[in-house]
């Protein structure tokens, strides 16, 4: 009989195998090809299981190798550092909310259901959209679900995606949609402005097989798409769905997508009270305009208000026949317990800041990112390759290889931007980057360039 070296209470293994008609654990897993099985014990400890104290000591030794940065990271690419009020952390840490339980039973879940309804309402107001679900995994999965949703609605097989959309989101989308035979056709961007090439978009939208047109606002380069309303009109003319990806904080400065009649809106709530993390959760935003054809094809949970037999108002999950626990393979999505806790964090953050707070924060981010860009381009032969206005993120082109600059930044315990090419990098500046941090970044880069030019 199989005996696990550490886990107790496995005496019933043989009895369980017999009950399901299997002779051994090997027989249980015989569907897995032999060539990919690991036929050895995994070395999960040095010689023996470690005690709690030994584990803490080993982890502490590893943690000491971490570098403490002199300033918040200047790398973004869609995940940006922001200040998180302590009230956000405190409220979502309460035991009533800090659970993975899905509120199927409204009679015992009114608290979390109302909190999620408040999130949906706040996000709908911010986006000026009619229906918002109770969260997706992240921006990439929300985009993928939007493309799949468009395909279910109109049956078409091509989605137009700009080259200047976030490449990480596009990779997630490709993974999700490839099994459905949906084709991605990339639209060029103007190399001068950094915005979507409208002429190329109109040319590629001439096909009758275009299911959806996606555009990101601001785009991956941080640039505002000034022709966003025209792009929506192109989608309407071709009877394709418009999918808009938004940075929610940018809506403190620019028109919300609902104001120009976007069909579907996606994004990430990381900007609204969530930390940076290494492989941890994000929070996907998903919203649609009021059209039952769209609403009934939405993925994910939706919380609504109803009344009981005594006419008391209550909160419950609605339109559940869309979901996999009822429809199985015919469901709109297989997402179930999702990022409800993080949606609550977004709701708390939005409630704390309010409309004026969001506007003031967006203005502060705009000012600081423009200050950083101005200071960097004051260095000889350092330029911004794109001319259009930007928010939070921006591209800088250097006269020397960016790897050399990044090495110098790391020496000074600074995290530079995301390398885009040999000489260009995408930088992120938010409200947490003060003048001292930005000036340190600039002086370090200036020093790196000077050292190469004089060598």
Swiss-Prot record:
It is an enzyme of class 1 (oxidoreductase). It holds the Pfam family GDC-P. It comes from Saccharolobus solfataricus (strain ATCC 35092 / DSM 1617 / JCM 11322 / P2). The keyword Iron-sulfur does not apply. Its EC number is 1.4.4.2. PANTHER family: GLYCINE CLEAVAGE SYSTEM P-PROTEIN, GLYCINE DEHYDROGENASE (DECARBOXYLATING). The glycine cleavage system catalyzes the degradation of glycine. The P protein binds the alpha-amino group of glycine through its pyridoxal phosphate cofactor; CO(2) is released and the remaining methylamine moiety is then transferred to the lipoamide cofactor of the H protein. Keywords: Oxidoreductase. CDD domains: GDC-P. One of its GO terms (biological process) is glycine decarboxylation via glycine cleavage system. Belongs to the GcvP family. N-terminal subunit subfamily. It catalyses: N(6)-[(R)-lipoyl]-L-lysyl-[glycine-cleavage complex H protein] + glycine + H(+) = N(6)-[(R)-S(8)-aminomethyldihydrolipoyl]-L-lysyl-[glycine-cleavage complex H protein] + CO2. InterPro entries: GcvPA, GDC-P_N, GDC_P, PyrdxlP-dep_Trfase, PyrdxlP-dep_Trfase_major, PyrdxlP-dep_Trfase_small. GO terms for molecular function: glycine dehydrogenase (decarboxylating) activity. The glycine cleavage system is composed of four proteins: P, T, L and H. In this organism, the P 'protein' is a heterodimer of two subunits. This is Probable glycine dehydrogenase (decarboxylating) subunit 1. The keyword Oxidoreductase applies.
């Amino acid at each position: 009989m199989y005996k696990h070296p550490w886990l107790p209470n496995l005496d019933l293994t043989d009895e369980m195998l017999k009950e399901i008609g299997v002779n051994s654990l090997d027989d249980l897993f015989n569907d897995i090809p032999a060539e990919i099985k690991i036929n050895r014990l995994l070395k999960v400890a040095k010689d023996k299981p470690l005690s709690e104290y030994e584990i803490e000591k080993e982890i502490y030794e590893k943690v000491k190798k971490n570098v403490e940065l002199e300033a918040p990271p200047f790398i973004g690419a869609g995940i940006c550092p922001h200040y998180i009020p302590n009230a956000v952390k405190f409220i979502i840490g309460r035991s009533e909310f800090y659970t993975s339980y899905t509120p199927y039973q409204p009679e015992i879940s009114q608290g979390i259901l109302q909190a999620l309804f408040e999130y949906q309402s706040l996000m709908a107001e911010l986006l000026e959209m009619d229906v918002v679900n109770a969260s997706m995994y992240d921006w990439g999965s929300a985009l993928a679900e939007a493309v799949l949703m468009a395909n279910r609605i109109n049956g078409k097989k091509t989605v137009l995606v700009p080259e200047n959309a976030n490449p990480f989101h596009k990779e997630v989308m490709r993974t999700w949609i490839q099994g459905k035979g949906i084709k991605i056709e990339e639209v060029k961007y103007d190399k001068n402005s950094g915005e979507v090439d409208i002429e190329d978009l109109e040319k590629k939208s001439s096909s009758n097989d275009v299911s959806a047109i996606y555009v990101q606002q601001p785009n991956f380069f941080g640039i505002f798409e000034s022709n966003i309303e025209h792009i929506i009109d192109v989608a309407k003319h071709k009877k394709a769905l418009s999918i808009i990806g938004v940075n929610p904080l940018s809506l403190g400065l620019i028109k919300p997508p609902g104001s120009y009649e976007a069909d579907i809106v996606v994004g990430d709530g990381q900007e609204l009270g969530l930390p940076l993390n290494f492989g941890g959760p994000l929070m996907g935003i998903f919203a649609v305009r009021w059209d039952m054809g769209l609403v009934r094809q939405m993925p994910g949970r939706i919380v609504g208000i109803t009344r009981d037999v005594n006419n008391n108002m209550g909160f419950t999950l609605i339109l559940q026949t869309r979901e996999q626990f009822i429809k199985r393979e015919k469901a709109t999505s297989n997402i179930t317990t999702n990022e409800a806790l993080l949606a609550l964090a977004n709701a708390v953050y939005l409630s704390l800041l309010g409309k004026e707070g969001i506007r003031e924060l967006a203005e502060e981010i705009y000012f600081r990112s423009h200050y950083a860009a101005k200071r960097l381009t004051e260095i000889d032969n350092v330029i911004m390759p794109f001319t259009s206005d930007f928010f939070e993120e921006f591209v800088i082109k250097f006269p020397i290889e960016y790897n050399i600059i990044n090495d110098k930044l790391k020496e000074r315990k600074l995290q530079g931007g995301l390398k885009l090419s040999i000489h260009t990098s995408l930088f992120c500046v938010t409200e947490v980057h003060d003048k001292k941090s930005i000036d340190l970044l600039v002086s370090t880069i200036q020093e790196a360039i000077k050292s190469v030019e004089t060598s």
